[in-house]
């Protein structure tokens, strides 16, 4: 036999509901705290961005001034009146052209960094200030909207509580009325059963006395039955009335329950999401995007300007050419480097001879001297060929040393999480002391040998 179902008492149901509502209320409070924290973090972030770019603007301006001082220091030397024409002539030489472009690049970098500092101070920082003001103002309004949404939700929960209590009350009345009706029905059945038993137990008597007794008993039974019937009808009417109220209250409770669940779902799934991205974050990310893109535009244009200057310097570096510079130098100072006039034969005391005299007795001497010169030239030619090969090999060695492609320092900019790797990379570059000392010693030794050969055998 199955045990009867256990029903929760009203107090248990109310307690569970109160607990659930308290949890929701606590959640709502934490939601506002969370949004407050987000607002504080946002304000702090925007303030940090302002301070960062303000400090960066100062650094850029200081850097610009230092670059300007650097350029002006050397440009002032170039503009000095001493040897002005010589300096002007030197400008056509490729190394001097590189130097001038380098100074111009520094000047342009100085101007660009001044512009960058101005953009930070008068464009980017005001944008962050505006974003901060807008964000604070919108958050304040969003908080008011969120508070109103939470108040509306709590109002719905309170209404559900009231409807639920009404349902419990009417349902309890209905159950009570039903119980009384059943009790009345039992009494009616019991009364009817008594009447039947009494009729069965009656013994035969005289006709007159029997008739009187029966009439009296019937009257009593009818009176009792009528009372019970009236009581039953009264309980039936009360039960019907309470049952109707209970059904209506139950319907109201179910409708309110459905509406409450829909309101809770709407608040948590839609309202909260809309509150954050359509109220609290309204325009925040877009405005921040514009401010940071202004920074990117400034930095990229600075980089583009620098690249243009570096491209000009790179072009000048590629045009570094010793042969062309030698030709330009000789053309500029033609009077210095042009060959002098030939020495002419100066006749003495009217002597007009201007050619060798190959007559006897000097002919044989001239022939012998010519043979000696030819023999000597053959020997020198062989020696010079060997010396030439040695000089060419030595010169090639020097050129290999001075043209080695050791200028790529890209590895120095491959940073990792550990600064030790950076230091290690830098220490292994061309400028490390052991490496450069060895290179310099090798180069100087080769140069010394080369010029020794030149001095011994001439050019």
Curated annotation (Swiss-Prot):
Task: Tell me the PROSITE patterns matching this sequence.
Answer: F_BAR
Q: Write the protein's name.
A: SLIT-ROBO Rho GTPase-activating protein 2C
Domain comment, as recorded: SRGAP2C is truncated at its C-terminus compared to SRGAP2/SRGAP2A. It only contains an extended F-BAR domain that lacks the last C-terminal 49 amino acids of SRGAP2/SRGAP2A, which are replaced with seven unique C-terminal amino acids. In addition, SRGAP2C acquired a series of unique nonsynonymous base pair mutations selectively targeting five arginine residues compared to SRGAP2B. This truncation and these specific arginine mutations reduce solubility of SRGAP2C and increase its ability to heterodimerize with SRGAP2/SRGAP2A to form an insoluble complex.
SUPFAM superfamilies named among the record's database cross-references: BAR/IMD domain-like
The record's note on quaternary structure and interaction partners says:
Homodimer. Interacts (via F-BAR domain) with SRGAP2/SRGAP2A (via F-BAR domain); formation of the heterodimer inhibits SRGAP2/SRGAP2A function.
Instruction: Name a GO CC annotation attached to this entry.
Output: cytoplasm
- What more does the entry say? This is one of the 3 duplications of the ancestral gene SRGAP2/SRGAP2A which has undergone human-specific segmental gene duplications. The appearance of SRGAP2C in the human genome is estimated to 2,4 million years and corresponds to the beginning of neocortex expansion in human evolution. The emergence of SRGAP2C at the birth of the Homo lineage probably contributed to the evolution of specific structural and functional features of cortical circuits in the human cortex. Expression of SRGAP2C in mouse cortical pyramidal neurons leads to the emergence of human-specific traits of synaptic development, characterized by increases in the density of both excitatory and inhibitory synapses received by layer 2/3 pyramidal neurons and neotenic features of excitatory and inhibitory synaptic development. Mice humanized for SRGAP2C expression in all cortical pyramidal neurons show a shift in the fraction of layer 2/3 pyramidal neurons activated by sensory stimulation and an enhanced ability to learn a cortex-dependent sensory-discrimination task.
Gene Ontology terms describing biological process: cerebral cortex development; excitatory synapse assembly; extension of a leading process involved in cell motility in cerebral cortex radial glia guided migration; inhibitory synapse assembly; negative regulation of cell migration; negative regulation of dendritic spine development; negative regulation of filopodium assembly; positive regulation of neuron migration
Q: Which GO terms describe its molecular function?
A: protein heterodimerization activity; protein homodimerization activity
Answer whether the UniProt record assigns the keyword Coiled coil to this protein: yes
Task: Note the SS bond partners.
Answer: none
Q: Does the keyword Acyltransferase apply?
A: no
Which SMART domains does this one have? FCH
Locate the compositionally biased regions of type Basic and acidic residues. 181-202
The parts of the chain that form a coiled coil are 363-401
Q: What mutagenesis or variant effect is reported for residue 73 to R?
A: Does not improve solubility
């Amino acid at each position: 036999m199955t045990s009867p179902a256990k029903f929760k008492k009203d107090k248990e149901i109310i307690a569970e509901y109160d607990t659930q509502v308290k949890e929701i209320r606590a959640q709502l409070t934490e939601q506002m705290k969370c949004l407050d924290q987000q607002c504080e973090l946002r304000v702090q972030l925007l303030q940090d961005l302002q301070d960062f770019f303000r400090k960066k603007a100062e650094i850029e301006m200081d850097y610009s001034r230092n670059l300007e001082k650097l350029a002006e220091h050397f440009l002032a030397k170039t503009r000095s009146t001493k040897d002005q024409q010589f300096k002007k002539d030197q400008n056509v030489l490729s190394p001097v052209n590189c130097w001038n472009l380098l100074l111009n690049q520094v000047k342009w970098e100085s101007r660009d960094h001044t512009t960058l500092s101005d953009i930070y101070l008068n464009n980017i920082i005001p944008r962050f200030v505006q974003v901060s003001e807008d964000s604070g103002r919108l958050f304040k309004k969003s908080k008011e909207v969120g508070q109103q949404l939470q108040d509306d939700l709590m109002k719905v929960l309170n209404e559900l509580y009231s409807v639920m209590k009404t349902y419990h009350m009417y349902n309890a009345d209905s159950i009570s009325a039903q119980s009384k009706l059943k009790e009345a029905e039992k009494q009616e059945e019991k009364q009817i059963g008594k009447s039947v038993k009494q009729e069965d137990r009656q013994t035969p008597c005289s006709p007159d006395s029997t008739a009187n007794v029966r009439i009296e008993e019937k009257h009593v039974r009818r009176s009792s039955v009528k009372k019970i019937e009236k009581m039953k009808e009264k309980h039936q009417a009360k039960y019907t009335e309470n049952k109707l109220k209970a059904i209506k209250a139950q319907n109201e409770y179910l409708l309110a329950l459905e509406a409450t669940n829909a309101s809770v779902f709407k608040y948590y799934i839609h309202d909260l999401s809309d509150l954050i991205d359509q109220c609290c974050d309204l325009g925040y990310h877009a405005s921040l995007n514009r401010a940071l893109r202004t920074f990117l535009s400034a930095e990229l244009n600075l980089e583009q300007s620098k690249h243009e200057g570096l491209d000009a310097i790179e072009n000048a570096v590629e045009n570094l050419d010793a042969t062309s510079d030698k030709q330009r130098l000789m053309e500029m100072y033609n009077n210095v480097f042009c060959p002098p006039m030939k020495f002419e034969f100066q006749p003495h005391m009217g002597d007009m001879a201007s050619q060798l005299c190959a007559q006897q007795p000097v002919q044989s001497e001239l022939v012998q001297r010519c043979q000696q010169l030819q023999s000597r030239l053959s020997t020198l030619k062989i020696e010079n060929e060997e010396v030439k090969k040695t000089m060419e090999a030595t010169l090639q060695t020097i050129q290999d040393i001075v043209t080695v492609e050791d200028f790529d320092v890209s590895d120095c900019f491959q940073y990792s999480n550990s600064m030790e790797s950076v230091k290690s990379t830098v220490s292994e570059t061309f400028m490390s002391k052991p490496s450069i000392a060895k290179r310099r010693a090798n180069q100087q030794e080769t140069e010394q040998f080369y010029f020794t050969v030149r001095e011994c055998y001439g050019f």
